[in-house]
Amino acid sequence: MKKIICYFTIILLTFGIDAMEDNNKQIYNPKETKFLEEAAGAEALKWAKERTNKTEKALQAMQEYKRIKKEIESIFYDQRKTLYGVIRKGYVYNFWMDDKNPQGLWRRTLVDNYYKDKPNWEVLIDFDKLSKKIGKKVAYRGVSNCVQNPNRYLISMSFGGKDEMFFREWDLEKKDFVKNGFEPITSCGKLLEGKFTYPTWVNKDTIIFNPVLYKDEITSSLYPNSLYIWKRGEAIEKARKLFEVPKEYIRVSADKLLSDAISSSLIFISADKDFYNYDNYILDTQDKNFKLQKINMPSDATLQGSFKEYVFWLLRSDWKFKNHNIKAGSLVALHFTDLLKAESDKTSLKILFTPTENEVFNFIGTTKDRVFLATYDNVVSKVVTFTLENEQWTKPVILKLPYQNAIFRMSSYEDEEEALITIENAIVPPTIYLWVKTHELKVIRKALYSFDSENYVLEQKEATSFDGVKIPYFIVYKKGIKFDGKNPTLLEAYGGFQVINSPYFSRIKNEVWVKNGGVSVLANIRGGGEFGPEWHKAAQGIKRQTAFNDFFAVSEELIKQNITSPEYLGIKGGSNGGLLVSVAMTQRPELFGAIACEVPILDMIRYKEFGAGNSWVTEYGDPEIPNDLLHIKKYAPLENLSLTQKYPTVLITDSVLDQRVHPWHGRIFEYVLAQNPNTKTYFLESRDSGHSSGSDLKESANYFINLYTFFANTLKLKLIKF
């Protein structure tokens, strides 16, 4: 499935009161800063460019810059990088970027050839050449294969790092885009783009997609609000509108309900009322009237996939089903025909997974004859497999993972017997396994680059938060370092939107930071999904301060254990994580030495006015509601900034093309902080990266060069010879 899913009272601590001063007084003049609200406005771009140039010049003058640049470029452009892929009709398909192909290559090789150190790749689309031909940076965003005609794909793309996407039909046999094929261009020649407009094949001559065909077909969160069915050969203006959601909804999307081998005509339609509640429907495209039938399931339950004629649903809240209480976080399966029935008639429903205090659902993966249920047990992967025999689910078989603290990932097509599985952890590079039809895992690719895991330590520890709750965190360091309070330490967390932070392998972090004596820490604070729905809800809305307090608890524990001290403790976070670290800066500046605030959400009073802000109301609360506003103002980083307080050295990043978190957030924070004579700030604005580190490989490499130079210099990391 392609559905885009990515008890407490607020305690007002003394540090919160001190930081507030008078947050009813606006800290900037709205008239003077109005120009910063226009993402691509000439005055705003000039303002941002001047500050970006100044920051780049300062970073490049630091003694660590050249050495870090050399190391990071060697990692990014290394031909020995892990070759991730997916199996389709005897081939492994892979997307690859290097220094000669920064926009990337979509390519394939035979499965038998994939075992080799240097597979013989057949390039299908060269996105650098395509970008030159079009005259704009074209970024690859994914593909959708037509089962009825396996030689046809829909290639999703975007210009730069934008969330707005478009697609073109690709002929695998001719190795070229299809002339007059599916491509959202109007009769006037206008290319239609829309945020996350992934198309869905109905059959070889029909697709369903969510374009912005007319100006008013967007929601208040700036996502498409309409679904169309489009037949081959007809003008896009002639496409039939199937469904439209109200403007206050977030978005509408469509995908196949079941695999094409079972039914190609059934379409699952999701209308997102808010971030956690949905109106879901089934559309049978064989019905000439295209009537939508509403699914009878809890509104906050989400479709996770299908296997044969059964669908999997994840519950976010407790569900009283036939006088039985099914716990929030449970995964249930039921026959697709039961989706439309009343509760009393859902005879096929089966609970496949019930969460425990430490174990939560991660994802469902399927092959043609097998289901993989991946969970996190104390934020470490656990996997079982099972199947369906005579309409009964078989007993789950534990898939033994090769080492402790393993993290499991899977890429597969539901009509293929084989799948590629990746296993890794924070200090063990990824190994790719082939799941074969005999139900065995075979090593197919190991990391070709050298990294000696035996020289490093990965531990999971706990800190105690303000209310006694234990907050786990992972810590990585080089064997033999002394815990003398002087270790440069990077602490990361997210703490929002049910996102689970797990200890994946980061070659950059390990080789640039940990290898040089730095310490890396990943905190699993509340607001995330590491321990299920209640872990998230504990820091949702007016309870937001919980996430910040959890983060402070981990920070204080690192200092208490003499692992580091404020002078050497750096924190980084992006998007919601940017909000987290900026609040840490304003509420507890004495705890930290350096802060990277990346594509951050910072203007919490006006966030609904920018980008996708309207879609976040169920996460943060609504600043237009007095009680919500009261709580938001207590932590809102922009409103709580002081023009005299000495804050840690801070790096702020944003992007002109970020269509989720508008660059206004980063710009206004820099604008205000620049007036504080006691705080050193750096500011970097990208033109093309969108809500990420870069729209191509070179842009991403430069981003991390600047980031790690900033931390290495500010936190006094002593670089050894590379």
Swiss-Prot record:
Gene3D superfamilies in UniProt? alpha/beta hydrolase, Prolyl oligopeptidase, N-terminal domain
What's the top EC group for this one?
hydrolase
List, in alphabetical order, the GO biological process terms annotated in this UniProt record.
proteolysis
**EC numbers:** 3.4.21.-
Q: Which domain of life is it from?
A: Bacteria
> Which keywords does UniProt give here?
Hydrolase, Protease, Serine protease
Where are the catalytic residues?
Answer: 575, 658, 691
Q: Which cysteines are joined by disulfide bonds?
A: none
> Which family does the UniProt entry place this protein in?
Belongs to the peptidase S9B family.
What protein am I looking at?
Answer: Uncharacterized peptidase RP174
Lineage of source species = Bacteria, Pseudomonadati, Pseudomonadota, Alphaproteobacteria, Rickettsiales
